[in-house]
Amino acid sequence: MLEKLIERVLFATRWLLAPLCIAMSLVLVVLGYAFMKELWHMLSHLDTISETDLVLSALGLVDLLFMAGLVLMVLLASYESFVSKLDKVDASEITWLKHTDFNALKLKVSLSIVAISAIFLLKRYMSLEDVLSSIPKDTPLSHNPIFWQVVINLVFVCSALLAAVTNNIAFSQNKAH
């Protein structure tokens, strides 16, 4: 009897995630606001904006879009996996969610982080002259911020590759059984 009560209480705690999911949807509102603000800035300066600044603005918009997609993916998958099934929604609209298990979600999150990091690096590359001009010429490589950003991006890439390989090995072993 005590065991069943404990199990019921533990299972009911999943609903504590629901307010967090709702709060996380506010992050989408903030990202949407930042996206529209950047888009408005780009459009309002269309006559005077340089090609480099236009590309940087576009990369910023892509970055915000990727981030919003990542938040939405984690939000929906978390709710679906841990709180309750999304049964009031047209199933054709969220078919990817039905086929997304925890390992697939980890892989998608890893790949999204790599993409966001790569966009950040590309934005830095577009302003490379400004960055390099602010660093003294005799600065060691370990003190160069671009060096560390590339290293961090490579860590993200290696982590995503390792997650993909691990997922593939685990999936092939489960398939064999």
Curated annotation (Swiss-Prot):
UniProt subcellular location: Cell membrane
Keywords: Cell membrane, Membrane, Transmembrane, Transmembrane helix
TM regions (residue ranges): 15-35, 54-74, 102-122, 145-165
Pfam families documented for this protein: UPF0114 (PF03350)
Main location: membrane
InterPro entries named in the record: UPF0114 (IPR005134), UPF0114_bac (IPR020761)
GO cellular component terms given for this protein: plasma membrane
Top-rank taxon: Bacteria
Bilayer topology term: Multi-pass membrane protein
Keyword field contains Cell membrane: yes
Protein family membership: Belongs to the UPF0114 family.
NCBIfam families (UniProt xref): HI0507 (TIGR00645)
Protein name: UPF0114 protein HPP12_0190
Organism listed in the record: Helicobacter pylori (strain P12)
